[in-house]
Curated annotation (Swiss-Prot):
Name this protein carries in UniProt: Thymidine phosphorylase
A GO CC term assigned to this protein in UniProt: cytosol
Subunit composition and interactions: Homodimer.
GO MF annotation: an example: thymidine phosphorylase activity
Annotated EC: 2.4.2.4
Pathway(s) it belongs to: Pyrimidine metabolism; dTMP biosynthesis via salvage pathway; dTMP from thymine: step 1/2
Annotated coiled-coil segments of the chain: none
Transmembrane regions listed in the UniProt entry: none
Listed SUPFAM superfamilies: Nucleoside phosphorylase/phosphoribosyltransferase catalytic domain, Nucleoside phosphorylase/phosphoribosyltransferase N-terminal domain, Pyrimidine nucleoside phosphorylase C-terminal domain
Protein task: The enzymes which catalyze the reversible phosphorolysis of pyrimidine nucleosides are involved in the degradation of these compounds and in their utilization as carbon and energy sources, or in the rescue of pyrimidine bases for nucleotide synthesis.
Annotated source species: Klebsiella pneumoniae subsp. pneumoniae (strain ATCC 700721 / MGH 78578)
One annotated GO biological process: thymidine metabolic process
Keywords annotated in UniProt: Glycosyltransferase, Transferase
A family per Pfam: PYNP_C
Amino acid sequence: MFLAQEIIRKKRDGQALSDEEIRFFINGIRDNTISEGQIAALAMTIFFHDMSMPERVSLTMAMRDSGTVLDWKSLNLNGPIVDKHSTGGVGDVTSLMLGPMVAACGGYVPMISGRGLGHTGGTLDKLEAIPGFDIFPDDNRFREIIKDVGVAIIGQTSSLAPADKRFYATRDITATVDSIPLITASILAKKLAEGLDALVMDVKVGSGAFMPTYELSAALAEAIVGVANGAGVRTTALLTDMNQVLASSAGNAVEVREAVQFLTGEYRNPRLFDVTMALCVEMLISGKLAADDAEARAKLQAVLDNGKAAEVFGRMVAAQKGPSDFVENYANYLPTAMLSKAVYADTEGFISAMDTRALGMAVVSMGGGRRQASDTIDYSVGFTEMARLGDRVDGQRPLAVIHAKDENSWQEAAKAVKAAIKLDDKAPEITPTVYRRITE
């Protein structure tokens, strides 16, 4: 039997906690036998004293085990259970293509996603732009869709990693969110509860990233790879660029439209293609569906070219109560904004920098995201035809097309876009889409 205050004291004094002590504390968070004050105190001691790798693994596994851990053995699936997690960005619609692409190559992708957070868009919010789409199927239906279609994208239920929800809520109001061991455990507790064989992490770098510097993004990626492999799940991470909007669009319905166009081959933004392919390659190799990069890319290109990936996406939408002909007729189903017109720069020049975070917040301000949990989302608003770093803009080439609910909202968004995009006389050096691959 342990005492919560003694566990806090031990960590306060810089000592390592045992697996048993960590499990006792996390179970107490779940059972409400540990107070909010005690959670806050432990979080702050971890913030200042960090955690060793064994402590990080114990914390993550205890949080995972605080609720249901999915088990797929009874389904006798003929492929690996694989998933991807992104630290979030703007125009990051990779999940909508990646899940169907990997499923079309023989993987099973039980993706449990989140809503928008701060300036970053949420996969669930995007999918809810599709009429009827059900992000909370019951457990049996979720399993059926995975078995029949190969991919489902759903919201987190209260039975998955419940200790994390309470722990995070306390961190949020006690200035202890940005602690690498706590971020790592929070991300992985939910992902490892999916019962995965393999995981790839997409850790963003740059002006629209969650972590403020390249060094901190790399440290987070290394921590996640170390802990997840320590917990028995084959995991790699990619550091990818978020110094500009990843897709050509940012919003909800506009990103779903771009995802369908990507899958059908109607339009593929080159940077979005690079990042999506790189993540899919990691999933195929870690899931043992391909031996190397070349084989993985060939398989992925084939399912794009022969329409199989688009077909899987359509089947997933139908299985989750969306329209059965969504891929063919997406334009008839997705909401459109009242006002859509281009915004132009006040001067000519090359785009040399982009405040991606500010562009994400502009989408939120238009109604495309939430400032508080009770807010309703306007799925139709956002940006399309986003200019990219290095593009030359003038009176002919706009910075973006803004989709807004009215003229006032359009004007505010136009101001935000102009302020977020910096022009120069000469073209900048273009940053890579993938900076680094991190393995155990």
